[in-house]
Swiss-Prot record:
InterPro entries: Ribosomal_bL33 (IPR001705), Ribosomal_bL33_CS (IPR018264), Ribosomal_bL33_sf (IPR038584), Ribosomal_zn-bd (IPR011332). It holds the Pfam family Ribosomal_L33. This is Large ribosomal subunit protein bL33. PANTHER family: 54S RIBOSOMAL PROTEIN L39, MITOCHONDRIAL (PTHR15238), LARGE RIBOSOMAL SUBUNIT PROTEIN BL33M (PTHR15238:SF1). The keyword rRNA processing does not apply. The lineage of its organism: Bacteria, Pseudomonadati, Pseudomonadota, Gammaproteobacteria, Enterobacterales. Keywords: Ribonucleoprotein, Ribosomal protein. Belongs to the bacterial ribosomal protein bL33 family. One of its GO terms (cellular component) is cytosolic large ribosomal subunit.
Length: 55
C-alpha cells in the first residue's frame, strides 16, 4: 500500500480557548509549522491559529 502524501493536522487557536480547525497539508512540500489567521467564534475575532498534529 502506498504511503499517504497528505497529513491531517489541527490548527489550534492562539487565544487558548480550545477551538480548532482540522485540515490537511502536504508532508513533502511544507515541512515547517503552518500558521493562519482565521476567525475564532469563541473570541469573536480573527486570531492566529497554530498547527498541531492530529492524533
Amino acid at each position: 500500500m502506498a504511503k499517504e502524501k497528505r497529513e491531517t493536522i489541527r490548527l489550534f487557536s492562539s487565544s487558548k480557548n480550545g477551538h480548532f480547525y482540522s485540515t490537511t497539508k502536504n508532508k513533502r512540500t511544507s515541512s515547517e509549522k503552518m500558521t493562519l489567521k482565521k476567525f475564532d467564534p469563541f473570541a469573536r475575532k480573527h486570531v492566529i491559529y497554530i498547527e498541531s498534529k492530529n492524533s
